[in-house]
From Swiss-Prot:
<feature type="compositionally biased region" description="Polar residues">
    <location>
        <begin position="482"/>
        <end position="505"/>
    </location>
</feature>
<dbReference type="Pfam" id="PF00271">
    <property type="entry name" value="Helicase_C"/>
</dbReference>
<keyword id="KW-0813">Transport</keyword>
<dbReference type="GO" id="GO:0006397">
    <property type="term" value="P:mRNA processing"/>
</dbReference>
<dbReference type="InterPro" id="IPR000629">
    <property type="entry name" value="RNA-helicase_DEAD-box_CS"/>
</dbReference>
<feature type="binding site">
    <location>
        <begin position="91"/>
        <end position="98"/>
    </location>
    <ligand>
        <name>ATP</name>
    </ligand>
</feature>
<feature type="compositionally biased region" description="Gly residues">
    <location>
        <begin position="466"/>
        <end position="477"/>
    </location>
</feature>
<feature type="short sequence motif" description="DEAD box">
    <location>
        <begin position="196"/>
        <end position="199"/>
    </location>
</feature>
<keyword id="KW-0378">Hydrolase</keyword>
<dbReference type="Pfam" id="PF00270">
    <property type="entry name" value="DEAD"/>
</dbReference>
<dbReference type="InterPro" id="IPR014001">
    <property type="entry name" value="Helicase_ATP-bd"/>
</dbReference>
<feature type="region of interest" description="Disordered">
    <location>
        <begin position="450"/>
        <end position="505"/>
    </location>
</feature>
<keyword id="KW-0509">mRNA transport</keyword>
<keyword id="KW-0694">RNA-binding</keyword>
<feature type="domain" description="Helicase C-terminal">
    <location>
        <begin position="258"/>
        <end position="418"/>
    </location>
</feature>
<keyword id="KW-0963">Cytoplasm</keyword>
<comment type="function">
    <text>ATP-dependent RNA helicase involved in mRNA turnover, and more specifically in mRNA decapping. Is involved in G1/S DNA-damage checkpoint recovery, probably through the regulation of the translational status of a subset of mRNAs. May also have a role in translation and mRNA nuclear export.</text>
</comment>
Length: 505
C-alpha cells in the first residue's frame, strides 16, 4: 500500500512556471497601449497581479481587459480589501480606482451561492453602466452574475431579473433602496458595501438613503469608500458606520500630472467664436465640452452643429434611453464632440478623450477637478481649456488657490506633444456594435477641421442639414425652448465660408 502511494506521488507533477506561461499564452489579450504614462500610475512598488494570489479565472479577465500591472491605488487597496477590512481610499481621477475595488470584490464572490454578495453604489446612471461593464469584463470567467439598476428605467424589469441569482448589484442609491424596501433585493447576506465617488454619495441629498441602505446589510459587513475628494461629512460617516478603516491617501497633489491647463479670457458673446477657433486649430481625438445648465448644453450643441461639426449632447433632463445611447455611441467613437452638463463629470472613463473645454467655468474647485479629469485618463496626456469671462475671474483665482495649481493663459500655439499621440492606433476603444459607424483612429486624430454635414441623430444627437441644426425633442428629453428668453451667446466669425448669425436668437 505504501509503495503504491509512493509511486503515485512520484508520478504526480505540480504546476510550474511553464504551465503558468501556457494559460497566459492562450489569452485573448488586446494590443498593448504604448502611450507614455505619468507617475500618477507608474510610481508603483513593482507588484504584479499574481502577487495578490487571486483566482486564475479572475487574472484571465484582468489580462484580457488590457491590464498589465497594478496601479498605485490598486497596489495599496487590493491586498487590504481581500482581508475584509473597511477601506477609505483617496486617489486622483483616472488612476484605476474602479478596478481597485472591483478586483477584490470579484475575488470574494462565491458563484455557487444565489445570494447578492456585493452592492456597489455610484451617484449617476452612466457611471453605474460603466462600473457594471467593468465587473462583467473582469469577471467573465468566474460565472458571476452582475446586475445594474438605476432610476429612469422600468422597475418591473429589475424585479424580474432579481428572481434569478444576482451576485453583484450595481446601482444608484434611490433605485436600490426602492428594491430593498420592497423586499425584492435581499441584502441580508451581502457582506460587501462599496461607494464610488463617495463624496457625492455622502452629500445631504444622498446621505439619508445611504444610511437606510446600510440597515439592510449584515452588521459584519465590509465598507469601502473611494473618491478623489473627501469633505468633512465623510469623517462623520466613517466614525458612525466604519470599523477601524484602513486609510489610503495618494493625493500629494490634486490635479493630474498629464493634464495641461489653459484659460482664454473672452466676452460672453465671443465664446462660440473662440470655440470655433479651437476646433479649427487643435488636433482633437475626442472632446467633452461642459456647460453650467441643461439649457445652455442644448443651445451650444445646436450652435456647434450649425458650424458644421459633429456633436452629441447629454444632460439630466433627457430620457434615460437617450442618455444611454449618447454615452454608448460616444464611447465607441461614433462622434468626436460631446456637450454636457456636470452629469458626466464623475468617474466616466473614455480613454480617447484628450481635450476638455469648460465653455462655462465651474463655480467650485471640486467640480473643476472632476471635469478636467475626463481627459488624461490613467496617466496619459490631456488638455483642459477654460473660457473665462469677467465674472469668472474670482472663481479662477479661488480654484487655483484651493487646488494649488496655476492655470496659464492660452498661448498663440499649443505644443501638440502636450496632448496629441504620434500613434493613435494605440488608444484603446471599447468594442463597438458592428451595425454602428465608428471613427478610425487615424480619422479621430486628424485635424478637427473635417466637417460632417450628414450626421443624423435625435434624443441628444443633432441632425445637421439644409444649413441649420435641428433636433427632435419631447417632454423629459430636452424640449425646444423660446429662444428669445435665452441667455444669448454667439459667434463673431464665420465657419468655412458658411454664413451664420452672430447671436442665437
Amino acid at each position: 500500500m505504501t509503495d503504491a502511494l509512493a509511486s503515485q506521488l512520484n508520478n504526480t507533477t505540480l504546476g510550474d512556471a511553464s504551465s503558468d506561461a501556457k494559460w497566459k499564452e492562450q489569452l485573448n489579450v488586446p494590443a498593448k497601449d504604448a502611450r507614455p504614462q505619468t507617475e500618477d500610475v507608474t510610481a508603483t512598488k513593482g507588484l504584479e497581479f499574481e502577487d495578490f494570489y487571486i483566482k486564475r479565472e479572475l487574472m484571465m479577465g484582468i489580462f484580457e481587459a488590457g491590464f498589465e500591472k497594478p496601479s498605485p491605488i490598486q497596489e495599496e487597496t487590493i491586498p487590504v480589501a481581500l482581508t475584509g477590512r473597511d477601506i477609505l481610499a483617496r486617489a486622483k481621477n483616472g488612476t484605476g480606482k474602479t478596478a481597485a475595488f472591483v478586483i477584490p470584490t470579484l475575488e470574494r464572490i462565491n458563484p455557487k451561492s444565489t445570494k447578492t454578495q456585493a452592492l456597489i453604489l455610484v451617484p449617476t446612471r452612466e457611471l453605474a453602466l460603466q462600473t457594471s461593464h467593468v465587473c462583467k469584463t473582469l469577471g467573465k470567467h468566474l460565472g458571476i452574475n452582475v446586475m445594474v439598476t438605476t432610476g429612469g428605467t422600468g422597475l418591473m424589469d429589475d424585479i424580474i431579473r432579481l428572481n434569478d441569482a444576482v451576485h453583484i448589484l450595481v446601482g444608484t442609491p434611490g433605485r436600490v433602496l426602492d428594491l430593498a424596501s420592497k423586499g425584492v433585493a435581499d441584502l441580508s447576506e451581502c457582506p460587501t458595501f462599496v461607494m464610488d465617488e463617495a463624496d457625492k454619495l455622502l452629500s445631504p441629498e444622498f446621505t439619508p438613503v445611504i444610511e437606510q441602505l446600510l440597515s439592510f446589510h449584515p452588521k459584519d459587513r465590509q465598507v469601502m469608500l473611494f473618491s478623489a475628494t473627501f469633505p468633512l461629512i465623510v469623517k462623520s460617516f466613517k466614525d458612525k458606520h466604519m470599523r477601524n478603516p484602513y486609510e489610503i491617501n495618494l493625493m500629494d497633489e490634486l490635479t493630474l500630472r498629464g493634464i495641461t491647463q489653459y484659460y482664454a479670457f473672452v466676452e460672453e458673446k465671443q465664446k462660440v467664436h473662440c470655440l470655433n477657433t479651437l476646433f479649427s486649430k487643435l488636433q482633437i481625438n475626442q472632446s467633452i465640452i461642459f456647460c453650467n445648465s441643461t439649457n445652455r448644453v442644448e443651445l451650444l450643441a445646436k450652435k456647434i452643429t450649425e458650424l458644421g461639426y459633429s456633436c452629441f449632447y447629454s444632460h439630466a433632463r433627457m430620457l434615460q434611453q437617450h442618455r444611454n445611447r449618447v454615452f454608448h455611441d460616444f464611447r465607441n467613437g461614433v462622434c468626436r464632440n460631446l456637450v454636457c452638463s456636470d452629469l458626466l463629470t464623475r468617474g466616466i472613463d473614455i480613454q480617447a478623450v484628450n481635450v476638455v473645454i469648460n465653455f462655462d467655468f465651474p463655480k467650485n474647485a471640486e467640480t473643476y477637478l472632476h471635469r478636467i479629469g475626463r481627459s488624461g485618463r490613467f496617466g496619459h496626456l490631456g488638455l483642459a481649456i477654460n473660457l473665462i469671462n469677467w465674472e469668472d475671474r474670482f472663481n479662477l483665482y479661488k480654484i487655483e488657490q484651493e487646488l494649488g495649481t496655476e492655470i496659464q493663459p492660452i498661448p498663440q500655439n499649443i505644443d501638440k506633444k502636450l496632448y496629441v499621440y504620434d500613434s493613435p492606433d494605440t488608444i484603446p476603444r471599447p468594442i463597438a456594435n458592428p451595425s454602428q459607424p465608428q471613427i478610425t483612429a487615424q480619422a479621430a486624430n486628424a485635424n478637427i477641421g473635417e466637417r460632417r454635414h450628414n450626421h443624423h441623430m435625435n434624443g441628444g444627437q443633432y441632425q445637421y442639414g439644409r444649413g441649420r441644426g435641428s433636433y427632435r425633442g419631447g417632454r423629459g428629453q430636452g424640449q425646444r425652448r423660446n429662444m428669445q428668453n435665452e441667455t444669448k451667446f454667439g459667434t463673431q466669425g464665420q465657419s468655412s465660408g458658411k454664413s451664420h448669425p452672430t447671436q442665437v436668437s
